[in-house]
Amino acid sequence: MNDVWQSDWSMMAPEWIVLAAAIALLVMDLALPSDRSRRPLAWGAAAAAALAMIATAAMIPAGSASILHDTFRLDAFAKAFKFILLAGGALALLLVAEWAPKEGSPHRGEFVYMMLFALLGAMMMASSGDLLTLFVSLELLSVSSYILAGLRKTAPASNEAALKYVINGGIATAIMLFGMSYVFGLTGTTNLGGIARRLQETNEPYMLALAFLLLLIGVSFKLATVPFHMWAPDVYEGAPVPATAFFAVVSKTAGFALLLRLLVTIFAAAPSEGRDPSSLLLSMQPIITVLAGLTMIIGSVVALRQRSLKRLLAYSGIAHAGYLLAGFAAMSWAMIDSLWMYLLVYTLMNIGAFAIIAHIVNETGSDDLDGLAGLYRHRPFLAAALGLFLLSLAGIPGTAGFIAKLHIFIGLVVTEPGHYVLAAVMAITTVISYVYYFNLIVQLFFRPTFTAPLGRLPAGLSTAVVLCALGTLAIGWAPGLAYDMLAQFGHFGDFLP
């Protein structure tokens, strides 16, 4: 117990900031009259997330360390992923500030602090060094997300989204917990470093493989990869737009942090059946490759027929999860850099797109594709910004999305010849995605307007759009900025315990 109190709690400064802000805003929400706007609470939460991001950046020069008996790790991996999580959380909270559902907004206060609690869970996942802290952090993120999905309490679509999210999330949690129980049974410890060391001496390759598959299935539910993706379009469509944006970027980033922290740490050196390959993680690459290919194909093809903007971006997100999973299939130290860069770019272009969609939904009450028609004629800035985000999502040369995809593509073709097919699938599905992204661009610039002109973009959405556009342009035109940031993190050289 004395060791716990003597720990360096300043290592958790970003988490303390987010937790303190969430509790303070919860109390303020209870104290404010019910007819008082909760908009300032959202701005305060965004400021707290930005402050936590500054605290995280201030810790970058420090070396790797751990507290609480190695259950909480502050290494370069944790700092880098927290940076993305906090950036995505702050931008999503700006969308909450301007959320104006047609049912009214009596629950906006809950929206703000529940998003902060979800963000706290995601941050803890990135720093977890133990199965117990991983699981508790995952549940904090998951339960908060279920509430966010159902906050439009009088909207049937929101209630349906929350129910589907709870059911699928519960199944994923049960499967993952089952896999963790196998790992604990084989090693007798929950510490990730201890598990990795003891698994090198185990002679139960089949039990190990089963544990790996159970954990992979559980994480795949969270990432919405095929065939565990069916919940995502319905949840994205029914949830409030700011919550959808949060799920699309923060939850996905946290999921990949979990995938890397859990599976790579534990199974990178674990033995498999036979002598070649000797690593269980390497022996499972064919399965991961198939999942990645199917995810890219189904996400891209099904997106072609969508009329709802939120469902379209949901299937687009499934395809992007496939691109990221392809990087995981060709895992190397350089690929971890590529995955981090891809998630950073994905956060910027996705939040920017959702900010504009949030404005369209606020103004028209619908997220139908026709809401984009002729937007350039009366809101040229919005049309240009959304066009930029769509081009980047498509991976057009000269954009940040192209740089991010190129890194993963190169990683696939240089690791081993077996990944050439996966690289070809990535290239083909990227071309398929041009169809639905350019369909949206045609709507923006070349179709007549079917609805009344949109009002001016509110301050919160304007801030989010401008920041995302500047970030997307900066990385697209000067990718060295992202490389310099990766150099600050030491290219994750201290990732393994």
Curated annotation (Swiss-Prot):
| NAD recorded as keyword | yes
Q: Which reaction does it catalyse?
A: a quinone + NADH + 5 H(+)(in) = a quinol + NAD(+) + 4 H(+)(out)
Entry membrane topology:
Multi-pass membrane protein
Q: Name one GO biological process term.
A: ATP synthesis coupled electron transport
- Where is this chain's protein located in or outside the cell? Cell membrane
EC numbers for this chain: 7.1.1.-
Task: Cite the entry's keywords alphabetically.
Answer: Cell membrane, Membrane, NAD, Quinone, Translocase, Transmembrane, Transmembrane helix, Transport
A Pfam family that the UniProt record links to this protein: Proton_antipo_M
**A GO CC term assigned to this protein in UniProt:** plasma membrane
One example of the protein's molecular function in GO is:
NADH dehydrogenase (ubiquinone) activity
What residue intervals traverse the membrane? 12-32, 40-60, 80-100, 116-136, 166-186, 208-228, 240-260, 284-304, 316-336, 341-361, 383-403, 430-450, 457-477
What this chain does, per the entry, is described as:
NDH-1 shuttles electrons from NADH, via FMN and iron-sulfur (Fe-S) centers, to quinones in the respiratory chain. The immediate electron acceptor for the enzyme in this species is believed to be a menaquinone. Couples the redox reaction to proton translocation (for every two electrons transferred, four hydrogen ions are translocated across the cytoplasmic membrane), and thus conserves the redox energy in a proton gradient.
Describe the protein's quaternary organization and the partners it interacts with. NDH-1 is composed of 14 different subunits. Subunits NuoA, H, J, K, L, M, N constitute the membrane sector of the complex.
Entry's family note: Belongs to the complex I subunit 2 family.
Please identify the protein, giving its name as recorded. Answer: NADH-quinone oxidoreductase subunit N
